[in-house]
Amino acid sequence: ELSNSGIGVIAVDGKCFKRYLEIARLLGNKVVVITDNDKDYDVNIKKSYKDYIDNQFPNIKVYSDIDNNRYTFEVCIYNDNKAICDKVFNTPLSRIPIQDYMLGNKAEAAFTLLKKHSNTIVVPQYIQDAIRWIDD
């Protein structure tokens, strides 16, 4: 559990994150970046994070889903947990696909899943890998 591991989590806006990585590089701090591929893994991850992916800085790793169809966290959560998400968010008043609901209501959807299914939800593999690396 992260809360007992000494690992801190910082949500960083896309415009600022490279400054944090530069500081981590200079200090030698172990840092993991977990990010969306935004429908283009090659450009948004491999190209944008080339120095970190090529292991030029072994204390910094970048993790993202490599499948462009799994372009954001909510899409990954839905695809890895369809039965749970459909059960939780499908109501008689639902007028849009469940995944679209989750994309439009990110915080509420995440909170609802955490509250009702924290022990059964499947965490996307790239996030599992990132946590395993940072905790090693």
Describe the residue ranges of each PLM region.
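Acidic, divalent-metal-binding catalytic cores of TOPRIM
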Residues: 1-136
